[in-house]
Amino acid sequence: MLQLCSTFRPQLLLPCQFRFTNGVLIPQINYVASNSVVNIRPMIRCQRASGGRGGANRSKPAKPQVKEGSNKTVIEGLVTESLPNGMFRVDLENGDNILGYICGKIRKNFIRILPGDKVKVEMSVYDSTKGRIIFRMSSRD
């Protein structure tokens, strides 16, 4: 019987077989103690069309925090006030008080930022009143 589905390649399923996710044919062996009979059944494993389980390619080098040629600087600061929609008041090391918003990776990974936390803020040279919070340094001391 031929089975087609959107995320897996077509495969041939024989009776009494199980499906796994990586395209290898493995014999399944059953031992019966009373008759000393060994049954060997081939098992077909299917493979995803994408070829992997997803996620990051671990062989690639890590990205630098700030790309070369960009007009951004990274400054450390202290969160003083929490505002709605992932916005914060941040006091920078140089004495400025800016509006900081959290970056997408912090939002995606549900990293909590509270008043009193030290953060790294990425700022553009064009607007010195706003910055993107790219890293939460450590727990509150």
Swiss-Prot record:
Listed GO CC annotations: chloroplast; cytosol
Primary location group: plastid
Domain of life: Eukaryota
CDD domains: S1_IF1 (cd04451)
Residue stretches making up the S1-like domain: 63-138
Classification via InterPro entries: NA-bd_OB-fold, RNA-binding_domain_S1_IF1, S1_domain, TIF_IF1
Transit peptide: 1-46
Subcellular locations according to the entry: Plastid, Chloroplast
Gene3D superfamilies tied to this protein: Nucleic acid-binding proteins
Keyword match Plastid: yes
GO molecular function, one term: mRNA binding
Keywords for this protein: Chloroplast, Initiation factor, Plastid, Protein biosynthesis, Transit peptide
Region annotated Disordered, chain positions: 49-69
Subunit structure, as described in the record: Component of the 30S ribosomal translation pre-initiation complex which assembles on the 30S ribosome in the order IF-2 and IF-3, IF-1 and N-formylmethionyl-tRNA(fMet); mRNA recruitment can occur at any time during PIC assembly.
UniProt function note: One of the essential components for the initiation of protein synthesis. Stabilizes the binding of IF-2 and IF-3 on the 30S subunit to which N-formylmethionyl-tRNA(fMet) subsequently binds. Helps modulate mRNA selection, yielding the 30S pre-initiation complex (PIC). Upon addition of the 50S ribosomal subunit IF-1, IF-2 and IF-3 are released leaving the mature 70S translation initiation complex.
Family note: Belongs to the IF-1 family.
Official protein name in the record: Translation initiation factor IF-1, chloroplastic
